[in-house]
């Protein structure tokens, strides 16, 4: 039963990888198909938006194709293994989880491709509101509580109070979620992640520091490029889109982002966002 939707999704994805943006995943009936249908919708939406772009760079298509191959291969291989009649329940659960994890990675990549495509083609227009940046940072950080507890990572925060910014809160949350995700992903068990928020009259400055593997200056120079992955071993899961998305959002908000890192020491990302002239309850 699992092999049919997996094959349908992988076949369609392969057509898109080869440049056929008219390919679509058909919706499937049954409550247990809901997860596969969501992936199908993401693939269809990506194909629709990519087909609307007048000029697609060859390297972009090649990189999309390359990044899709790994999760698709996992889905295909484990989908085949699930068909074995004598498969134990333990193995069945293990293989199903592998398919779920691979499909989630594929869906995340689709989401980032769509967001980046819209931002680059000015199809997303910022909707600025004035809000407390410290509160947003804390809310975003708390989403990773289970991760830092599981990895026994020490959390240190130094958040200045009453720092207001006028920005698109939803877009800005993408920045923090990507930076926190990277920090926890690259920090080993027992490490440390530090979040600080400071401000001067003009800017709010956010620093996210980890004690992870770090990176060389050569890698740091390219880290905000689409599909660039400093970890060429693929020991950590990623698709090289998150930081490109972060950079684009910060640019749209006329902010600044930089990175400092040292191999086997850790990494610090610094983001500067212009402060709001007035808080939400203040008047001119």
Question: Predicted regions: what is each one?
Answer:
Residues 251-284:
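C-terminal end segment of the histidine kinase catalytic
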Residues 190-202:
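Short beta-strand/loop element within the Bergerat-fold HATPase_c
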Residues 183-184:
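Short helix-loop "hinge" at the ATP-lid/N-box region of the Bergerat-fold HATPase_c
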Residues 215-227, 247:
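Short conserved segment of the HATPase_c
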Residues 26-29, 127-131, 149, 154-164:
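Conserved catalytic submotifs in the C-terminal HATPase_c
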Residues 146, 213-214:
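Glycine-rich G1-box
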Residues 101-107:
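Short alpha-helical segment of the dimerization/phosphotransfer core of two-component systems
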Residues 1-61, 78-83, 88, 97, ...:
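Membrane-proximal HAMP signal-relay module
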């Amino acid at each position: 039963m699992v092999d049919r939707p997996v094959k349908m999704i992988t076949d369609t994805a392969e057509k898109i990888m080869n440049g056929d943006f008219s390919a679509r995943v058909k919706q499937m009936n049954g409550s247990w198909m809901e997860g596969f249908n969501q992936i199908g919708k993401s693939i269809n939406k990506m194909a629709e938006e990519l087909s609307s772009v007048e000029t697609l760079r060859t390297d972009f298509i090649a990189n999309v194709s390359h990044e899709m191959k790994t999760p698709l291969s996992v889905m295909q291989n484990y989908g085949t293994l699930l068909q074995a009649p004598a498969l134990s329940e333990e193995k069945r659960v293990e293989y199903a989880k592998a398919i779920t994890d691979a499909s989630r990675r594929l869906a995340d990549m689709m989401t980032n491709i769509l967001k980046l495509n819209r931002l680059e083609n000015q199809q997303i227009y910022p909707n600025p509101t004035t809000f407390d940046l410290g509160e947003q940072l804390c809310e975003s950080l708390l989403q990773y509580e289970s991760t830092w507890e599981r990895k026994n990572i020490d959390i240190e925060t130094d958040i200045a109070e009453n720092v207001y910014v006028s920005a698109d809160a939803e877009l800005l949350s993408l920045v923090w979620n990507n930076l926190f995700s990277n920090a926890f992903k690259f920090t080993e068990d027992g490490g440390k992640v530090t979040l600080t928020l400071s401000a001067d009259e003009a800017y709010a400055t956010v620093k996210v520091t980890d004690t992870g593997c770090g990176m060389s200056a050569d890698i740091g120079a390219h880290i905000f490029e689409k599909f660039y992955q400093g970890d060429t071993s693929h020991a950590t899961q990623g698709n090289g889109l998150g930081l490109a998305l972060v950079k684009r959002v910060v640019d749209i908000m006329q902010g600044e982002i930089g990175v400092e890192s040292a191999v086997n020491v850790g990494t610090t990302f610094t983001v500067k966002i212009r402060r709001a002239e007035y808080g939400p309850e203040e008047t001119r």
